[in-house]
């Protein structure tokens, strides 16, 4: 009973913080410069994790200048974890997110790029959009697995979006992400796989005990002249090694 009550309190606070974020987006963002917006994004992301009982830690440093970040994907919380450290990152996300209440407006404000996965040719469009962002000196983040996993392993990495980095000779920095809690080295509380709904995942996340998320920023890989499939395999091996996962 006590655990459920704590989860309810966390969820109520999360809703309040989400509404606060919406107010910032609607009222403050129009008059803030890019740096000030990024600081708001960092603050909001860290606090939302904290409200849900999740501690954020990072190791290593994000590369300076334009970069494509390649992150393993576990939960809808991954974006907040990365934004807590790299608030300037623009994520490539599935278009389904635009249908999520409240969340859609918030991720829009962070410059999210949307991919219609059902349309085969949309990937090519997004590659061009990402390449343009990288040429403009921006930081873009992608989930090469294309969907979430349980965190116990890594799914195959898709190479399509890496072409944007190769075409612009922009480095790709792998980031190893892991959620853990007091009972598990790989937390089950934040799982968002299969038929799990966003509401169900939100509830189990709020019920978690001592959940933390750790990001390990690994050395960037050069892309000039690279083969995108070989690059995808190398990035997967980098992240697997950092997480202690065997992908042989």
Predicted regions and their residues:
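A transmembrane-helix-recognition feature enriched in membrane-embedded lipid enzymes
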Residues: 1-57, 105-110, 208
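Catalytic core of membrane glycerolipid acyltransferases/transacylases, capturing the structured
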Residues: 20-31, 50-51, 64-120
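Soluble, non-transmembrane catalytic domains of enzymes that act on hydrophobic metabolites at membranes
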Residues: 51-61, 77, 112, 156-167, ...
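Residue-level preference for the first positions of well-ordered beta-strands
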Residues: 66-68, 139-143, 171, 214
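A cross-family acyltransferase "interaction/gating" segment
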Residues: 102-105, 152-226, 234
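A membrane-cytosol interface segment of integral membrane proteins
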Residues: 113-134, 237
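Soluble extracytoplasmic domains of inner/organellar membrane proteins
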Residues: 123, 130-162, 166
